[in-house]
From Swiss-Prot:
The gene is dxr. Pfam families: DXP_redisom_C, DXP_reductoisom, DXPR_C. 1-deoxy-D-xylulose 5-phosphate binds at residues 123, 149-150, 186, 209, 222, 227-228, 231. This is 1-deoxy-D-xylulose 5-phosphate reductoisomerase. Its EC number is 1.1.1.267.
Amino acid sequence: MLGSTGSIGTQTLQIAEEFPEQFRVVALTAGQNLDLLVQQIQRHQPELVALANADLLPELQQRLDALGTDRKRPQLVGGPDGLNIAASWESADLVVTGIVGCAGLLPTLAAVRAGKDLALANKETLIAAGPVVLPELKKSGSRLLPADSEHSAIFQCLQGTPWAENARLSTGVPTPGLRRIQLTASGGAFRDWKAEDLENATVADATSHPNWSMGRKITVDSASLMNKGLEVIEAHYLFGLDYDHIEIVIHPQSIIHSMIELADSSVLAQLGWPDMKLPILYCLSWPSRLETPWRRLDLTEVGQLSFRAPDPAKYPCMQLAYAAGRAGGTMPAVMNAANEEAVAQFLEEKIHFLDIPVVIEAACERHKADLIAHPQLEDVLAVDQWARMAVREQVKRGTTRVPLAALAA
């Protein structure tokens, strides 16, 4: 479990506890939440624990020593190399990647190169490094199983088609018979706000999601619809469709998690309550399904399902993501890194919510002349660092916000 103390990690470990006959946790990685990590170590008794911050290893060792149990202690490793060791741990059959942002890229690649199957909750890995990751998947035979709700929904819908064998998510080639993907979006924290009212948006407003329980960064991405834009790029890499055939639909109830249209014009959808444990469980149990006592969907309780097209004037980040995806090469990596840095600056209240698309667009514009069409890993890592620095520099200079209508034009 990469990122065991985060939102995806804690929910994955809850599932492992619910199904002890099916799943055993062999390795955990975490950032710096030692309190929760120690509890997880006690509960799951992994063989290996990796800390992203190697400086915290002595403190973790002391805390484990203080427990004074007779149980076998896990091996402790730290830093980037430690994360890679955990990601390629020999006794692991499946690696769940829940590390937020581009920090998850190198451990994910380590897992792929070790031939591990992956439950991918870290969408930034494919977005920033799709041209690097997909050939590695083909080489190693690893399978990529999407752990976020939308791509899991698409994957599940494809299981009911004659092309299920092609939907292995390991090549990025077009899925035969798949005509269109419709990614559903809740609309995020500002779905019922008027575009002009976003001038008054605060960090507290942007981090209050109406439907899903998620981490702060992804909740802000949901509010800007950048999250859905990133998912468009991810869907392009996973299922091989071009951007003209991947659409975003606002669906406030978050009951339909995504839809696919097939060659005969029929549409398949996957439904369920908005609960991340459902797609995570499917990744862990695929191709089987495990019986759960979880709350069952009652459509009469839901009452109605509604849909509308997203307003480009209100969600400029969505347009930026489509543009970066179509540009290809290193542009998605630049856009993703610029967004990560912009959101971090917003959460620290150094910029306004409406500055987020402005600084992202500026970084993407600056990168156009230097775009690398067929990047190597080193190129992706280099432009990632460059884009973060470009955003920080712009924030220091001060942002010049432009009207929303101008951004959408």
